[in-house]
UniProtKB/Swiss-Prot annotation:
GO terms for molecular function: structural constituent of ribosome. It comes from Shewanella amazonensis (strain ATCC BAA-1098 / SB2B). Pfam families: Ribosomal_L35p. GO terms for cellular component: cytosolic large ribosomal subunit. Belongs to the bacterial ribosomal protein bL35 family. This is Large ribosomal subunit protein bL35. Disulfide bonds: none annotated. Gene3D superfamilies: 4.10.410.60. The keyword Signal does not apply. It comes from the Bacteria.
């Protein structure tokens, strides 16, 4: 059986941790002037992927 392919887009966006997968938060690319400094600071923090989405990401990262 051939090696399974890793989804490269998913590999760049998610990192496997002991508690699941961590990801960057959205809403920090553009239209930043109307967002408060506090909101932008909190959006910089990484967060965990929802439990319901973990199996799909795990399928796309077979060697993670």
């Amino acid at each position: 059986m051939p090696k399974m392919k890793t989804d490269r887009g998913v590999a760049k966006r998610f990192k496997k941790t002991a508690n699941g997968f961590k990801r960057k938060q959205a809403h920090l690319r553009h239209i930043l002037t109307k967002k408060s400094t506090k909101r932008k600071r909190h959006l910089r923090a990484k967060c965990l992927v929802a439990k319901v989405d973990v199996p799909a990401i795990a399928r796309q990262l077979p060697y993670a």
